[in-house]
Amino acid sequence: MGTASRAGIASARRIVVKVGSSSISGENAGQIAPLVDAIAAAHARGAEVVLVSSGAIATGMPFLRLDDRPADLATQQAAAAVGQSVLIFRYQESLDRYGIVAGQVLLTAGDLAAPDHRENAQRAMERLLGLRLLPVVNENDTVATHEIRFGDNDRLAALVARLVDADLLLLLSDVDALYSRPPEEPGARRIEHVAFGDELEGVEIGSTGTGVGTGGAVTKVAAARLAAEAGTGVLLTSTAQVAEALAGAHVGTWFAPRS
């Protein structure tokens, strides 16, 4: 049974944390350490944590001397091939401070749609968690086609949350919560709670992602609904507030799960 309300966040036994490209690459690469600090704190109190991390393409771009996200698939795949190894190294370097070992898991949404692939992924994930390791999941951008162009790791995170029967899905971004309209616009109101089945009528959800990522508010709301439908509580907040979020502080937007 998932976490039914905010009150249960601090005691959630199994947590999926999703972080986006713009939060941990480029000038924000330094945010990996505080993200790991928060995950390690949850791990230390007994929680099992899965990290779904975007960022392979964005991390690889400087090594290919690219200032902007490449438009063509082959260059995206090349950037991902370089960036994924650098990204996992950075995570492990930070995790070493806590004696936690990362296990890299590369998936596509299609992998989780095929029953045999899904079963294999589930078995591997359960074993990693049982060994008290940290599965670090990313979309397999080097071989993905449709997903690399139009997919997003928000949806992948929701599917992973369903795969491991997570109590909590924590969706991290550059914005601290869901707002009634783009937060930079006058009159934007922070939404603290979304009841299960709420269609969010009157809420203007922009679809534009960042320059290095593919997600935005639309993908996060869709992912939150997908996870909530399966009984997983979802909290949407900023990467800067990850420690407070995992400690149960009243931050972000809570999506109540199906009861």
Swiss-Prot record:
Keyword tRNA-binding among UniProt keywords: no
Tell me which domain of life the UniProt entry assigns to the organism this sequence originates from: Bacteria
Catalyzed chemical reaction(s)? L-glutamate + ATP = L-glutamyl 5-phosphate + ADP
Q: Which GO terms describe its molecular function?
A: ATP binding; glutamate 5-kinase activity
Residue sites binding ATP per the record: 18, 173-174
**Which residues does the annotation say bind substrate?**
54, 141, 153
Enumerate the Gene Ontology biological process terms. L-proline biosynthetic process
SUPFAM superfamilies reported in the protein's UniProt record: Carbamate kinase-like
Q: Which Pfam families match?
A: AA_kinase
EC annotation from Swiss-Prot or TrEMBL: 2.7.2.11
Q: Which GO terms describe its cellular component?
A: cytosol
Q: Which UniProt keywords apply?
A: Amino-acid biosynthesis, ATP-binding, Cytoplasm, Kinase, Nucleotide-binding, Proline biosynthesis, Transferase
> Key word Nucleotide-binding present in the record?
yes
Instruction: Name the protein family.
Output: Belongs to the glutamate 5-kinase family.
Relate the protein's function as given in its record.
Answer: Catalyzes the transfer of a phosphate group to glutamate to form L-glutamate 5-phosphate.
Q: Which NCBIfam families match?
A: proB
The identity of this protein, by name, is Glutamate 5-kinase
